[in-house]
Amino acid sequence: MAGGRPAGSAIEMEGAMRTLPSSGRPSGTGWQSRGPLFGRNYGLSPGSRLLPPRCQENADPQKMAFLLRKQWTLYSVSPLYKFSSADLKDYARMLGVFIAAEKQKGLAVDVDGELGIKVAMSGLPELRGSEQDPAAVLVQLSLRSSVSPKNSEEKLIWSGWFCCVAGDDLLENLPENFTCLPLFLVNGAESYTAIVGSWFQKTFDCCFRRLAISPLNLTWMAAMWTGCKVDKNTAATELLFSVPHLPQPLDISYAIHPEDAKALWDTVQKTPGEITQEEVDVFMECLYSHFHRHFKIHLSATKLVKVSTGIASAHCDGIIKFLQSQYLIGVLMLLTELAISQIQ
């Protein structure tokens, strides 16, 4: 199947061909929802989840726009000890001193000697699923001139933000003096991420881990995001598969027209607003069968590595891109769940 293609090549196929695959839903009662709404049994595959369209009516448009259409690398973070959102300015100053000290030791990123790094921390109270969730925290690093810092332009070079959206179960059992912000998203150089993470670990006795996304959770994302209402001009739903056991890497890109994907989902979904494991499985099986019918390739023998929709895109390596602000809370709910399952 590689056909002599160079390493890292990809086969792009328009899977839907404007022909809607049938749902093929199994009859009987063998398929049941196995868990509470939105999978509160952390660490287990939930029976059902919910992706609510949550418009950010009171959100700062500039801050929301800043989060969109960027590649964010995902981390899970254990609870922070004696962290206070009231002290963000002090934390920013302390982190700035720490970065300067690391730079003097040769551990920080090597930058122009005429430049210094400015640290800013601010709250993002809009990014909460409930009043019980702590406000998200945004950390930004900017370069500024040390010759005339007052008049110089600052260049944003790194951003990271901590959040907890609908982390009710963990919050209920959280010990005193701990703050739960289990999801950390980063855009910028890994060297800055390492330094910022080191300071947080030393200051708040927490632990960071890269957060990967399993193929199973990618199928959930494909189904959940397909079920959301978006503009007609949205991009195609695209699934990227990696073919294993080949001498050279090979990816298969499966693109489905968004209207066809939504129409298929509507034939699969039983309860509006709620998505079950059964429905995810049936949805993916329909897509796989349709693809095999046209291209004679069994996608079930490959590995799903990336999902792209009009709502967001996600890669198995733990890379996410948000595309719709009105669904940002819903996407963060799922990512928070995955982060909590990793730290428990």
Swiss-Prot record:
Region forming the signal peptide: none
Polar residues bias (residue ranges): 20-32
Please provide the record's keywords in A-Z order. Centromere, Chromosome, Nucleus
Pfam families per the record? CENP-L
Question: Where does the UniProt annotation locate this protein?
Answer: Nucleus; Chromosome, Centromere
Highest rank taxon of the organism: Eukaryota
Q: Which GO cellular component terms, listed alphabetically, does the Swiss-Prot or TrEMBL entry include?
A: inner kinetochore; nucleus
Which InterPro entries does the entry link to? CENP-L
| Residue span of region Disordered | 1-32
SUBUNIT field:
Component of the CENPA-HI complex, at least composed of CENPH, CENPI, CENPK, CENPL, CENPM, CENPO and CENPP.
Q: What's this protein's function?
A: Component of the CENPA-HI complex, a centromeric complex involved in assembly of kinetochore proteins, mitotic progression and chromosome segregation.
What's this protein's family per the entry? Belongs to the CENP-L/IML3 family.
Q: What is this protein called?
A: Centromere protein L
